[in-house]
Amino acid sequence: MSDNTSKGRILVADDDPAILRLVRAILEKEGFVVITARDGKEAYKALQESTGITAAVFDVVMPHIPGPELVRYMKTEKRFMNIPVMMMTAEQDPKLSRDSFAAGAVVFLPKPFTTAQLQTMLRMLVGRAKS
């Protein structure tokens, strides 16, 4: 699928390959171009090298650079500050969701989640990207 017919470009970063595959499959089925990263450093590099990212999905706890730190960085860069971010985590600490929202995330999804829950949250995220 070419960028001309896609609904947008979404950066997805998670150190769990199964989660990456699931999120990518759902987003591609919805017509998005998906850029994946296996850790925070890869996500940071993708942000620097990719153009036209319309939304991002980050795991809270990733090697090298945690999700909230990536979001804080995005909020300091003019070209990234309006990109909506969804955070996900399997950790049960409620502080992580507070930290994610404080960093600037707009959607938070605890793992494990159902495909329907993920689709609902992704639609919310993409709705933010369009507004």
Protein language model regions, located:
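The feature encodes the CheY-like receiver
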Residues: 20, 63-64, 81, 93, ...
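Active-site beta3 strand of CheY-like receiver
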Residues: 51-58
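C-terminal output helix
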Residues: 113-122
